[in-house]
Amino acid sequence: MNAKDFNLEAVQDACNEAAMQARTAAKIAYVQIGERDACGFAWVNVYGVRSNSKLGKALQSFGFRKDYTGSLQLWNPSGHNTQSISVKEAGAYAYAEVLKNKLGLEKVYAGSRMD
């Protein structure tokens, strides 16, 4: 998606669906894994979107923040309260996939690190 074909409703729909998919993926992973995994964090990075653009401002309204790499980043997109890194990664991957498919953004990646 670029500035020419920016559509606020499409961004809102994509972010809402991505959040729902992330929560669902995290719940499924939690049922399978539970708390018996390494502790960690997960997030989604969106590269190539300026934070002062319409798209950037729309993403920021859904919790994205500019990080040190210049990307827009959303921590724990599933909102799951577990410490299990695998559960949080499942949510982050699901969120990133929806943004790629719904908004046509190419540089959307899930990331994680152990605590």
Give the residues covered by each predicted segment:
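N-terminal leader/targeting segments
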Residues: 1-61
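Ordered hydrophobic segments in well-structured contexts
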Residues: 43-45, 73, 109
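Detector for the mature cores of small, proteolytically processed
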Residues: 55-78, 98
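Short, compact, well-ordered microdomains
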Residues: 75-115
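A generic structural signal for short, non-catalytic loop/turn and secondary-structure boundary residues
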Residues: 37-39, 67, 103
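Sequence-level detector for tyrosine residue identity
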Residues: 30, 47, 68, 93-95, ...
